[in-house]
Amino acid sequence: MDSLGTAATQFLFDLFKELNKTNDGNVFFSPVGISTAIGMIILGTRGATASELQKVLYTEQGTESSRIKSEEEEIEKREEIHHQLQMLLTEISKFSNDYDLIISNRLFGEKTYLFLQKYIDYVEKYYHASLEPVDFVNAADESRKKINSWVESQTNVKVKDLFPEGSLNSSTKLVLINTVYFKGLWDREFKKEHTKEEDFWLNKNLSKPVQMMALCSSFNFTFLEDLQAKIVGIPYKNNDISMFVLLPNDIDGLEKIMDKMSPEKLVEWTSPGHLEQRRVDLRLPRLQVEETYDLEPVLEAVGIHSAFSEHADYSGMSARSGLHAQNFLHRSFLVVTEEGVEATAGTGVGLKVSSAASCELVHCNHPFLFFIRHRESDSILFFGKFSSP
């Protein structure tokens, strides 16, 4: 992994740890999308606010070294961060006939604030994003509807009413939105006639019915002896993107995996040298995961404080004082079906798939971790915990 990939993976773990504390059920987010959104904020911040943001992304290596650097060196360093993120976005946003991957970022700012043209130019250059002035002071609800309409347009109308009525008001100065949408085709489709209703065990005493898909084929696979867990890599068409599932053997074994997991371990477990092609009898529930987070308290917990305070330094964004981020919303949406694409949910009576003796059984009928990784950039696009249908 390069330095950006390593930093992004560490940031992923920080985010997951905090999101998991406050979410007993499913967790699903895009570390790449959130890192990109923070990059846009860094573009407009200066001083301690910028340094704080860079530290959270593991791109700032200490306050002492920062103090002795010249202003020119600091500018050069900031530009390198944005250049790396720009290259990452360009790589993962390449057009494909086999999947849709849409990462959208937008800033909505109160129109009475004059935003610096240099900032507007840079946010367009590095992030293909724009800052749109809206009238929060006199037309907060109209502005809310405008923002929601933009979100719908970026997510194929799958994400509606991101901001509920009354969530924005005349005191709102800046809203930052990051939306991630993914839709892909499996390299090897599950057969619909093999899908059947099964119990998904939330714990040893409670279960919910799910539509369980089944496929016996060759996948990248490994068994983690010390954790009593299995990892299987499920490729999407053309193998640019794969979903990895980390499944504990025991119904209540997920906590042990999360306790032992680290950025280094995750890279090690899923490296080509650690995985091998095996015949796997894979049982995976149909998934529809949609999660929305106000990331302000989460980011504060991992070390970002001043960016959301009235003392934030956004002088790289506007010459006027008093500007600070008030809302940082993140919504991600994923559907997993037999084809891998969105489809109308339905209950099918299928045929049982018998496990051959040579097949490793990976039966995802209890809580597991999963993530979707882009091969060329070695970036984790999405990370999640599925614990409740």
UniProtKB/Swiss-Prot annotation:
Site note Reactive bond, residues: S354, S355
Coiled-coil segments: none
GO cellular component annotations of the record: cytosol; extracellular space; nuclear speck
Keywords from the named record: Cytoplasm, Protease inhibitor, Serine protease inhibitor
GO biological process: negative regulation of keratinocyte apoptotic process
Main location: cytoplasm
PROSITE patterns reported in the protein's UniProt record: SERPIN
SUPFAM superfamilies, sorted: Serpins
One MF term in the entry's GO annotations: cysteine-type endopeptidase inhibitor activity
Key word 4Fe-4S present: no
UniProt-listed Pfam families: Serpin
Subcellular location: Cytoplasm
Assigned protein family: Belongs to the serpin family. Ov-serpin subfamily.
Protein purpose: May play a role in the proliferation or differentiation of keratinocytes.
Stated name of the protein: Serpin B13
Gene designation per UniProt: Serpinb13
